[in-house]
Amino acid sequence: MKKETKVQLIIIVILSIILGILVFTLFKENNNRNNMFAPMEEEVEKETSKDDVDNGDTINEENINLNNYESNINITKGGEYNISGSFNYSLIVNSTEKVILNLNNVSINSEITASIANINTGELVINIPKGTTSTLKDKGSSEYDGCIYSSGKLTIQGDGKLYVYGNQEEGEGIATTDNDITINGGEIYIESADDGLNAGGDNGGTITINDGNIYIKASGDGIDSNKNLIINGGKVYTMGSSIGGDAGIDTDGSFEINGGEVIALGSDMLQSPDKSSKQKYVSFTLTTKISKNSNISLKDSKDNEIISFTADEDLKTLVISNSKLSTGTYYIYVDGEKTEYSKAID
């Protein structure tokens, strides 16, 4: 091969390599430019549907040990069920008949919806036997937006302890839709991302508290009824959000205190009991907030203490009622110091 031919061949090879590099570079830049202006895929959290909740095992045995199951449990027949053990799913009640659940040291930590959901029209009764402690937690996002949720009437009773943590997005602690909630007993502790105890829906439901020790710490309203609230007994401590726009108690209808002990605290909204209430009460809207962890006392004009408690959050509204209140003037003390706030009862 002649020397000139070799040189020409080398030049052709070099030019081919350069041309290839240029073509690859232009293609890559054009592809990047197209990707730059392509719409980004948004990660959307899927709301749990009824079909998702219905998936699982249908169990209608009298004794149910949650440790034996790795999916939701569906109860479809009326009757009384003894529940024990723990799992990370949901206990679904789907019956038109009355269902009673006896919680015997149960632990439910649901990943996608309510820990206990009654999705049909039958009444749900949750019994907390004496000497037991049960804990319910939920998270995710679903139409069953209470850690305990019921489409039918809901009754909670017993002498045991029940801890409820409503962690769903905008989730309630205990909730119904267009139906009543009745609490007849138990030591019940509720924390929630929204309302603690909620009877919602277009028609609402009446919340009735006859007995029990109830503690509520909510990021929304402590107790919210789209209908009525009646407190006949027990001890109720309810704290609404400290951020603003929420109350210890909020109802669309009547609000009666006929007995028991009630402490309802909030950030700015205040709803006082109806005058038809059979038990005396005092309510305050303060001009300056009382700080979290302050010790608060209510005393009469003779310096007798009526009630005392610790504020779990900053607050500016208070409703207080117990059997010691009668005609007279009452004063708020904070950390042992008498404040400017007083209220007279006729």
Give the ranges of each region predicted by the language model.
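A composition-driven surface/loop motif
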Residues: 3-346
